[in-house]
């Protein structure tokens, strides 16, 4: 594809859906690790160099691309650019919501909260009130946006 006309004007995003549940690696064979995936941004001009260990998720792809392109107009997204330092991820599995931040992992089942410092959820830590507030507001914003069909801007291009 390097010989295609569009190649030099394309940003490629390579990622995965989730890890295999049959993984033998202890870092991935757990409730958090199974959602750990690589995310690679590539451009032919090599402007996207380096490696980052920030916590990201699929909802960060669009804001990241808009950031790289220098897009400044308003847009709707639950994610953030991976090129910012504010890193977090949220996922839901059955009744369990999980917020992953640099401070740890916050589990939420039926409004009961527990926090852990490790991906295998063995080392409990004190709940971070800021993380609880963030997770509650995210869930509320997401639910209301879905219920009232507000997952769009009223802004016209």
Task: Explain the meaning of each model-derived region.
Residues 1-157:
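Solvent-exposed soluble domains appended to multi-pass membrane proteins
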């Amino acid at each position: 594809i390097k010989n295609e006309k569009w190649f030099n004007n394309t940003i490629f995003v390579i990622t995965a859906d989730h890890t295999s549940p049959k993984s033998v690696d202890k870092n991935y064979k757990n409730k958090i690790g199974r959602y750990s995936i690589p995310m690679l941004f590539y451009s032919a001009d090599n402007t996207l160099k380096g490696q980052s260990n920030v916590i990201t998720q699929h909802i960060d792809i669009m804001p990241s691309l808009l950031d790289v392109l220098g897009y400044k107009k308003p847009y709707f997204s639950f994610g953030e650019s991976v090129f910012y330092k504010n890193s977090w991820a949220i996922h839901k599995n059955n009744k369990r919501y999980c917020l992953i931040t640099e401070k740890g992992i916050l589990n939420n089942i039926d409004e009961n909260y527990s926090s852990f410092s490790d991906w295998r959820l063995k080392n409990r830590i004190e709940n971070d009130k800021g993380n609880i507030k963030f997770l509650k507001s995210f869930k509320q914003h997401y639910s209301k946006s879905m219920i009232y069909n507000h997952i769009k801007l009223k802004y016209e291009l």
